[in-house]
Amino acid sequence: MPTVLALETSCDESAAAVLRLNNGCLQVIASRIASQVEKHAQWGGVVPEVASRLHVEALPHLVEEVLQEAGQSMARFDAVAATVTPGLAGALMVGSVTGRCLAALHALPFFGIHHLEGHLASVLLAEHPPRPPYLVLLVSGGHTELIRVGAESEMVRLGRSHDDAAGEAFDKVGRLLGLAYPGGPAIQALAAAGDSGRFSLPKGRVSKPGGGFHPYDFSFSGLKTAMLRLVQALSEAGEDLPRADLAASFEQVVADVLVERSLLCANDQGLKTVVMVGGVAANRRLRELMSKRGQEQGIEVHTAPLRYCTDNAAMIGAAALQRLVSGDDASSLELGVAARWPLDKTEDLYHSPPPF
């Protein structure tokens, strides 16, 4: 049974996992995550240098823990995988160097995984994973994209955010409302007691040069600015800030926009399945609204398991196992890391010489 050790250190989560493919089913044998959220909360966001140092401290222990839990020695693995792009360069380097060293020491193939490919693979860890073709709404702190996954697992981006990602907007609005970092869970908790219809907020559009709008693209900067002005106006009027209503109204309009454009894109593409992955896919209002609207339109909705929505190593292992069993080439041990790399150039990560 093909088995991989996977590592993830692209931002503020150190993670290691052991995965196995058993009769065509992905099995997570062991998975560990060391979150840095509390460390970064005092600054209201991720500090790259601090993140890198914490990865260096945490990752060796996580690797040891998953090996012990899996009862697996390195000699029994078929490959090692690590996230190499996109992300914070210093943070990526910790996982990449660790993975490449382990692969070299034990004469194992190394798979440098694109972080977004990992998120796309996270839905395969569900009890009943969808079968392609389908449309993926990848919505996280750094990315908001609509990606068509074809029958041969080919990936084509059909829509994207032109400014802030949805998760980034949650963080910034959370800070505006005086909430703890990260903003997503804090806004969800506060919004539960609020009136989502109290405030009218804009659904950002992206204009085309020749007129009209990009139908599947997103823009959250205008929404963020509208929230800022609304909070300022309420404060200047001497009113107590209705934080729960503000949070609920913001959360609702984000969910509305994501659902409307995802389902429009799926219908236009003739796709009957929509998949949600990424940290924001854990949002309760978004999940409920997508399921409700999808059912009304005859579209099946799948979401990655909650524990695999945020950054984790299991999704990286899932992507690596897909490549391993498909007979794809492994990455060069000379492969470095890149803060940015387009998803449509993922195959370059397996070329020799490597692209970076």
Swiss-Prot record:
Q: Which Pfam families match?
A: TsaD
Family the UniProt entry places it in:
Belongs to the KAE1 / TsaD family.
Source species, please? Prochlorococcus marinus (strain MIT 9303)
**Which cofactors does the annotated protein need, by name?**
Fe(2+)
Under the heading HAMAP family, the entry gives: TsaD
List, alphabetically, the GO terms of the cellular component aspect: cytoplasm
Enumerate the residues binding substrate.
Answer: 138-142, 171, 184, 283
| Stated role | Required for the formation of a threonylcarbamoyl group on adenosine at position 37 (t(6)A37) in tRNAs that read codons beginning with adenine. Is involved in the transfer of the threonylcarbamoyl moiety of threonylcarbamoyl-AMP (TC-AMP) to the N6 group of A37, together with TsaE and TsaB. TsaD likely plays a direct catalytic role in this reaction.
What processes does the entry annotate via GO biological process terms?
Answer: tRNA threonylcarbamoyladenosine modification
**Would the keyword Kinase turn up in this protein's UniProt record?**
no
Q: Which PANTHER family match?
A: TRNA N6-ADENOSINE THREONYLCARBAMOYLTRANSFERASE, TRNA N6-ADENOSINE THREONYLCARBAMOYLTRANSFERASE, MITOCHONDRIAL
Cofactor binding: number and manner: Binds 1 Fe(2+) ion per subunit.
- Binding positions for Fe cation? 115, 119, 311
Superkingdom as given in the UniProt entry: Bacteria
Q: What is the official name of this protein in its record?
A: tRNA N6-adenosine threonylcarbamoyltransferase
Subcellular location per UniProt equals: Cytoplasm
Enzyme Commission code: 2.3.1.234
Can the keyword Kinase be found in this entry's annotation? no
Query: Reaction catalysed?
Result: L-threonylcarbamoyladenylate + adenosine(37) in tRNA = N(6)-L-threonylcarbamoyladenosine(37) in tRNA + AMP + H(+)
